């Protein structure tokens, strides 16, 4: 089916320029690259861009620690990031930086338009100030107790337990992450973006189909709780762009970071000497399509602030946000101590890029689900699918064609109906690539690979080759197998760029989507060379060990949980005695509708029942498994009203968060209501 060529601009979230690219980052860049490569195969005009997010307090402070300038640090990180992405064959048309003249000009332009249109408000605020470092503390540089659910060790912008958002000044017992000092309050004039003015527009945009259902539902929660004005300024010292006519005030990193998409595209247009395309893609009534691939952790900024900023400054809004989940390794959060926090560069020292591209692709869908990289399953799947099913199909047939027929394929198809079955699948597979149902596309392709190998097994060319007078049959069978291999590799071309190059060299032709409608007949192929090597668990073991060694080399004197979560200040025995810890029996456990973090627990204290909301859902995806288990709870914690009901206590758990949360249990014999002493 002939498609009308579209103009498409695709972006990935901008990696922060203070650390290396790891396998968590690579999920998004691989997902976007597969989609982009498919769009290009279908004849669409695609501009695929990215940049480093190069501003903010963390970069300023890390550069100070390294004894270099922020500019030097972000320059080195940019080179490292680009090398990693090139190693994974991410086909960016441009990779830039938010610390660029294009981004400065666009940030100032958008800010000036927002101000002219009345969407920038000035007001004096009280904020936390580190007296030891002599600096105001951004929200992520303050930790304390959540003012909503009272969970300790939460950042100054949102609680990872209950999901509440708040200002750093609302934290209970705040501490500076920079120095550990107790902050003091100081007044400062700040600039705010009037986000509530865009509530009606954002709600209409949410319902327009521009967002996945899960994202739209989450946005509805934010609308119900009310949108707040957004502080877009930061005080010196700060590494970023100074706000025009406001000495000592800088744009908050999240203002100029998404503008970095525009800055990178502007840089690309300038490199091409193209003064038209930028406006063509970004003007208010643009007919070009704009897609952002992002992780679920930055949905808030991309689904609320970014479209509102664009609307208020007379630019177009995104066509769609494509949101994905996190990466776990072997069923758990990536861990430096276990060697599963794997950098992109470390991976490439042990495996090729196509292997990870294939594994991620086989697991991805259009939903916001986390992806688990199970390293044993990875080895089995790559060997079973790429080596045994696809590459082996070519190797089983190529030898006979090269040796017996001088590399020339038969002039007719041995089984036209089977070939039609393969080409007819283009519509289903293409739709799966288009809709980002990548796992479905891979399943369809592997089902075809099974059919192709079954055909070869049934025709047994190795037997035919020994029978006199059957040369024509042998050529026809092997040519059929090679033609089926060609179709499979065409469907896999968006996923496996390096294997595709080797396949095209063997087939002596470029693989194109429409080209499969015409089989290779009477065509000369090149001598067959090994296309792909099997992988084994020894490589995995070496990869994990190398990742551990990298951590050891970079480790500070303090390692383990205490490094990230130091012991709190000493308290008196009288303070501790105020906490009444009791054994409780979990009578019921269930999901909380409207929350992806909480479970509702019904607890028996041996004489009364308690209803407790606990942020442990990520570690206990099957709440029924908790029923009948004993745990420890804080029984005298004041009840707190939540959106879902009243929580009458807190259960005790350990761990860094995510899937690594471990509910505490007493020894056998403890009864509900027993006091923990």
UniProtKB/Swiss-Prot annotation:
The cross-references to NCBIfam families, in alphabetical order and at most eight, read: metG, metG_C_term, PRK00133.1
The residues the record assigns to binding Zn(2+) are 146, 149, 159, 162
Disulfide-bonded cysteine pairs: these are none
Its assembly, as annotated, is: Homodimer.
InterPro entries on file:
aa-tRNA-synth_I_CS, Anticodon_Met, Met-tRNA-synth_bsu_C, Met-tRNA_ligase_1, Met-tRNA_synth, Methionyl/Leucyl_tRNA_Synth, MetRS_core, MetRS_Zn
Alphabetized GO MF terms:
ATP binding; metal ion binding; methionine-tRNA ligase activity; tRNA binding
Cofactor field: Zn(2+)
List the PROSITE patterns: AA_TRNA_LIGASE_I, TRBD
Q: Specify the enzyme's EC class, one word.
A: ligase
GO BP, sorted A to Z? methionyl-tRNA aminoacylation
Using the record's annotation, list all stretches that form the tRNA-binding domain.
575-677
Q: Where in the cell is it found?
A: Cytoplasm
The name this protein goes by in its record: Methionine--tRNA ligase
Which parts of the sequence bind ATP? 336
First-listed, main subcellular location of the protein, grouped into a coarse class: cytoplasm
Motif 'HIGH' region, residue range(s) on this chain: 15-25
A GO cellular component annotation here is: cytosol
Give me the gene this protein comes from: metG
The record's EC number reads 6.1.1.10
Which keywords appear in this protein's UniProt record, sorted alphabetically?
Aminoacyl-tRNA synthetase, ATP-binding, Cytoplasm, Ligase, Metal-binding, Nucleotide-binding, Protein biosynthesis, RNA-binding, tRNA-binding, Zinc
Keyword Acetylation in record: no
- SUPFAM superfamilies associated with the record: Anticodon-binding domain of a subclass of class I aminoacyl-tRNA synthetases, Methionyl-tRNA synthetase (MetRS), Zn-domain, Nucleic acid-binding proteins, Nucleotidylyl transferase
Q: Which protein family is named in the record?
A: Belongs to the class-I aminoacyl-tRNA synthetase family. MetG type 1 subfamily.
Q: Which reaction does it catalyse?
A: tRNA(Met) + L-methionine + ATP = L-methionyl-tRNA(Met) + AMP + diphosphate
Which purpose does this protein serve, as stated in its record?
Is required not only for elongation of protein synthesis but also for the initiation of all mRNA translation through initiator tRNA(fMet) aminoacylation.
The note on cofactor binding and number reads: Binds 1 zinc ion per subunit.
């Amino acid at each position: 089916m002939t498609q009308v060529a579209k103009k498409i601009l695709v972006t990935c979230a901008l990696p922060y320029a203070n650390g290396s690219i790891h396998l968590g980052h690579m999920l998004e860049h691989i997902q976007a690259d597969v989609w982009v490569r498919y769009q290009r195969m279908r004849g669409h005009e695609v501009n695929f861009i990215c940049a480093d997010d190069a501003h903010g307090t963390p970069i300023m402070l890390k550069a100070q620690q390294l004894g270099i300038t922020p500019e030097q640090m972000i320059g080195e990180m940019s080179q490292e990031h680009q090398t990693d992405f090139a190693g994974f064959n991410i086909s960016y048309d441009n990779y830039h930086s938010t610390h660029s003249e294009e981004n400065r000009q666009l940030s100032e332009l958008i800010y000036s338009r927002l101000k002219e249109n009345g969407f920038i408000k000035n007001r004096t605020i009280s904020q936390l100030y580190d007296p030891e470092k002599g600096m105001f503390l951004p929200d992520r540089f303050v930790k304390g107790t959540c003012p909503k659910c009272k969970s300790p060790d939460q950042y100054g912008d949102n609680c990872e337990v209950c999901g509440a958002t708040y200002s750093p000044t609302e934290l209970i017992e705040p501490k500076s992450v920079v120095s550990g000092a107790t902050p003091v309050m100081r007044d400062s004039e700040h600039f705010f973006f009037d986000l509530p003015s865009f509530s009606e527009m954002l709600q209409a945009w949410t319902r327009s189909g521009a967002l996945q259902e899960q994202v739209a539902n989450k946005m509805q929660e934010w609308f119900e709780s009310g949108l707040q004005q957004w502080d877009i300024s930061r005080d010196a010292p700060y590494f970023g762009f100074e706000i025009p006519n406001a000495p000592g005030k800088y744009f908050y990193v999240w203002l100029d970071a998404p503008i970095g998409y525009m800055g990178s595209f502007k840089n690309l247009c300038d490199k091409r000497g193209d003064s038209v395309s930028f406006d063509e893609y970004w003007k208010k009534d643009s007919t070009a399509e704009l897609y952002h691939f992002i992780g679920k952790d930055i949905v808030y900024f991309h689904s609320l602030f970014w479209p509102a900023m664009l609307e208020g400054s007379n630019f177009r809004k995104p066509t769609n946000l494509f949101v994905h989940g996190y990466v776990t390794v072997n069923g758990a959060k990536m861990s430096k101590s276990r060697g599963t926090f794997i950098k992109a560069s470390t991976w490439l020292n042990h495996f090729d890029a196509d292997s990870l591209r294939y594994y991620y692709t086989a697991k991805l869908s259009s939903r916001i689900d986390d992806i688990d990289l199970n390293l044993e399953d990875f080895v089995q799947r790559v060997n079973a699918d790429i080596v045994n099913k696809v590459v082996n199909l070519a190797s089983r047939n190529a030898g006979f064609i090269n040796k017996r027929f001088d590399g020339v394929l038969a002039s007719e198809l041995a089984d036209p109906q089977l070939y039609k079955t393969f080409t007819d699948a283009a519509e289903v597979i293409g739709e799966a690539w288009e809709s980002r149902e990548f796992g479905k596309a891979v399943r369809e392709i592997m089902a075809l690979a099974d059919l192709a190998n079954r055909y070869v097994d049934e025709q047994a060319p190795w037997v035919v080759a020994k029978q006199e007078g059957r040369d024509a049959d042998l050529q026809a069978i092997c040519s059929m197998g090679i033609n089926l291999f060609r179709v499979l590799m065409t469907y896999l071309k968006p996923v496996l760029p390096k294997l595709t190059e080797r396949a095209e060299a063997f087939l002596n032709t470029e693989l194109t989507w429409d080209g499969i409608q015409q089989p290779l007949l009477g065509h000369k192929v090149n001598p067959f060379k090994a296309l792909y090597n099997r992988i084994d668990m020894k490589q995995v073991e070496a990869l994990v060990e190398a990742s551990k060694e990298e951590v050891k080399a970079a480790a500070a004197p303090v390692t383990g949980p205490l490094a990230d979560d130091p012991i709190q200040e000493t308290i008196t025995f009288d303070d501790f005695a105020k906490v009444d810890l009791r054994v409780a029996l979990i009578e019921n456990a269930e999901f909380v509708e409207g929350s992806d973090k909480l479970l509702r627990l019904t607890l028996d204290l041996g004489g009364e029942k308690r209803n407790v909301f606990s942020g442990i859902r990520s570690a206990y995806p099957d709440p029924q498994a908790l029923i009948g288990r004993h745990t420890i709870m804080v029984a005298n914690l004041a009840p707190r009203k939540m959106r879902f009901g009243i929580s009458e206590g807190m259960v005790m758990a350990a761990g860094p968060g995510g899937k690594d949360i471990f509910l505490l249990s007493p020894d056998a014999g403890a009864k509900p209501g027993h006091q923990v002493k």
